[in-house]
């Protein structure tokens, strides 16, 4: 299975790619991002993603990150679909300091 991860806008692209191509990615990392726009049939797409057999869906965001509200929308969508995921929240904001932490935590999960 392939892995995909992204930070900030790249995290948004990760969400879009995985809900539109649910059978492609088995390991998904979303760092400091969330749902910023309405997606057509988000509930159905999330259910299809869940059914595809995702091995790991990992989300992280800093408590002071300006995208926290969008991040919470992603968590609500994941909860609604019943998707299993791990969530990590730490201090700090939208910064490379946090993204280094997130990548160092997520990358070992791929092996």
Language-model features: where?
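Non-catalytic cap/lid and distal C-terminal segments of serine-dependent acyl enzymes
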Residues: 1-111
